[in-house]
A protein has these predicted regions:
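Short helix-coil boundary/hinge micro-motifs
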Residues: 1-123
């Protein structure tokens, strides 16, 4: 995976993310990725190498970006192109190529959430 040490996103990484994520990755959004900001899923910190890479980026509108940064929404990207959101009310959403799936706020949602983090067995 291509990674750079700067906050600015090189064109080759931008193209890779836009091809992977054709739409904004906020739950239930239908906005084209081409017109959105590319947001660092894990916020960028000066001096930490390799943070700007496709597996740490996703297209978000400014409004969704502000919701993530200041509005209580939590975001994780356990695999490139798979986005897990937690709303301020505790609801879980999984966003990927096939759209948004509401996973609720109960024990089952936690099981589904954790399933994306499991590594496949070797073999």
């Amino acid at each position: 995976e291509i990674a750079v040490d700067s906050y600015e996103i090189p064109e080759r990484i931008s193209r890779q993310v836009i091809l992977r994520d054709s739409h904004e990755v906020f739950p239930f959004s239908a906005r084209s990725a081409r017109n959105q900001d590319l947001d660092h899923t894990i916020p960028y910190r000066e001096g930490v190498p390799g943070q700007t890479r496709a597996s740490n980026l996703g297209p978000l509108s400014r409004k969704a970006h502000r919701g993530k940064t200041h509005g209580g929404w939590q975001l994780e990207q356990p695999a490139p192109g798979v986005f897990h959101w937690r709303s301020p009310g505790g609801y879980h959403y999984r966003v990927g190529r096939n759209g948004t799936f509401r996973q609720g706020s109960d024990k089952l949602s936690q099981i589904l959430w954790n399933a994306d983090y499991r590594k496949p067995p070797d073999g």
